[in-house]
A protein has these predicted regions:
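Flavin (FAD/FMN) cofactor-binding and adjacent substrate-gating region
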Residues: 62-95, 254-266
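Generic N-terminal leader segments that precede the first folded domain
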Residues: 2-6, 24, 33, 55-57, ...
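Glycine-rich phosphate-binding loop and adjoining beta1-alpha1-beta2 segment
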Residues: 52-66, 247, 281
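Short, solvent-exposed coil/turn linker segments
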Residues: 38, 59-73, 182-183, 328
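Charge- and polar-rich, low-complexity intrinsically disordered segments of small proteins and propeptides
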Residues: 49-51, 74
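Flavin (primarily FAD) cofactor-binding/catalytic cores of flavoenzymes
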Residues: 1-48, 96-448
């Protein structure tokens, strides 16, 4: 981990400051090290260590993508940061090749992400939650990033890769905590509720996504006898579109095609491809869940209760269990469900104009008035992920988004690993272009 000595941190002018060191930031750091070793970059990460989906590392769950769509392979198959090299270095390559599974286990991939991050520890400071961004001009235009601990960091270019914000429906927002949580917090919230109750739990899972089905299966598989209330607006879990033709949406050529399409064409393409990534479930998970429900019926039990075509109309979190008011969407029939824990498998917010979207990442609020917006009020983003300044705003240092651009770049920016390494190269080329390739390691400052 980078040593943060306070004064040096505030005086150093880096070439690049990255906010967020998740998979997107790690992939970019790997590309910078291998392809631009003279460029001085520093990433700020709010967590105390690198992590990938820590709240959803469920036993038996997989990544749903090819193992070589990793942090480096598509950019450089000879990179030491590939998943295969991780397996080689950790002595598990042959064992992995013998596993009868299409995709890597999520727990294995999380270890891979941490392993790569450890190799790049000189490029990151952990425990630094970025809270503010401002623009300064002395000695050259640059960004100043403030953090919750009071330290500030400066960079001639800024890359924002904070990940998407969990989407929490309005009725649930006042109740978030130990008994109502987003799926991204599932594992540790469940552990706390188990400890508090000391017996089987009633858990309501809201949504019909891959995460919703995996959580239902995980609860049923545990030896605690939990009961699951699966609450969904549709008739049931739907099968994910895994056609190789649809999977070509994760090709860089499709990213070019999508980016250059009209707004109407993008909307049409997004609707066509939605079942390949949203509100749908892999076949193996669906089949396992259905067999579990059938087997419960054979034994005279009902531990997975489906509340089909239902929406939540009210939430109460007084003494005792959480009370959810439900309404059947077609008949209007009302009923109530009580739960010791409510898990919201309701997805994440994108950058876009829709009701559930955000116009820009929250961290950019202080500088948003100087950034170009489209006619819907959403950040303009160019093909290399550069966010141009607003006309008349004057000179601005370059700003890039890393992994937040599904609205403009398609499914490759939808939180998947599939194009991470190629996006890192595109970002690197954009940074070089915007800074000027002849300018590197500004001020010659030592890393803090």
């Amino acid at each position: 981990m980078t040593i943060d000595n306070g004064r040096t941190a505030e005086e150093t002018l880096h070439d690049v400051i990255g906010v967020g060191f998740g998979p997107g930031g790690i992939a970019l750091a790997a590309a910078l090290e291998e392809e631009a070793p003279d460029m001085d970059c520093l990433f700020l990460e709010s967590r105390s260590e690198a992590a990938w989906q820590p709240g959803m590392l469920l036993r038996g769950s997989d990544t749903q993508h090819h193992p070589s769509r990793d942090l480096a392979t598509l950019r450089n198959p000879r990179s030491r940061y590939t998943f295969l090299n991780y397996l080689h270095e950790t002595g598990r390559l042959l064992a992995f090749l013998n596993v009868p599974a299409h995709f890597p286990l999520r727990r294995d991939y999380a270890r891979y992400v941490r392993w790569v991050a450890a190799q790049l520890s000189s490029s990151v400071v952990y425990g630094r939650r970025a809270t503010t961004v401002s623009v300064a001009s002395d000695p050259v235009p640059h960004y100043v990033v403030g953090t919750a601990c009071g330290r500030t960091y400066r960079g001639r270019a800024l890359v924002v890769g904070t990940g998407r914000t969990p989407y929490v429906p309005a009725d649930f927002r006042p109740h978030l905590g130990d008994r109502v949580c987003h799926s991204s917090e599932y594992t540790w919230r469940l552990e706390k509720r188990r400890a508090a109750k000391g017996g089987p739990l009633d858990v309501a899972v809201v949504g019909a996504s891959q995460s919703a089905a995996e959580i239902a299966l995980d609860l049923h598989s545990a030896a605690f006898g939990d009961r699951v209330h699966a609450i969904m607006r549709g008739f049931g879990y739907r099968l994910k579109d895994t056609s190789p033709f649809s999977e070509e949406a994760y090709f860089p050529e499709f990213t070019d095609y999508y980016f250059n399409a009209s707004r109407e064409a993008r909307a049409d393409l997004a609707a066509q491809l939605r079942p390949s990534n949203y509100s749908s479930v892999d076949q193996d998970v669906l089949e396992s869940l259905y067999v579990r429900r059938y087997e419960d019926g054979v034994d005279g039990e009902e531990r997975i209760l489906l509340h089909r075509n239902h929406e939540v109309t009210g939430v109460e979190t007084g003494e005792g269990p959480v009370r959810l008011a439900l309404r059947e969407r077609h008949t209007g029939e009302a009923k109530e469900v009580t739960a010791d824990l409510v898990v919201l498998a309701t997805g994440y917010r994108d950058l876009g104009p829709a009701e559930h979207d955000e116009p820009y990442p929250g961290i950019l609020g202080p500088v948003a008035d100087g950034l170009a917006l489209d006619d819907t009020g959403v950040l303009r983003v160019e093909r290399d992920y550069f966010v141009p300044p607003r006309q008349g705003a004057g000179a601005r240092p370059p700003l890039f988004l890393n992994g937040l651009c599904e609205n403009t770049h398609g499914l490759g920016d939808a939180g998947s690993f599939s194009l991470l390494s190629l996006r890192a190269r595109t970002l690197l080329e954009g940074i070089r272009h915007r800074l000027g390739t002849e300018q590197t390691a500004a001020d010659g400052g030592a890393r803090d």
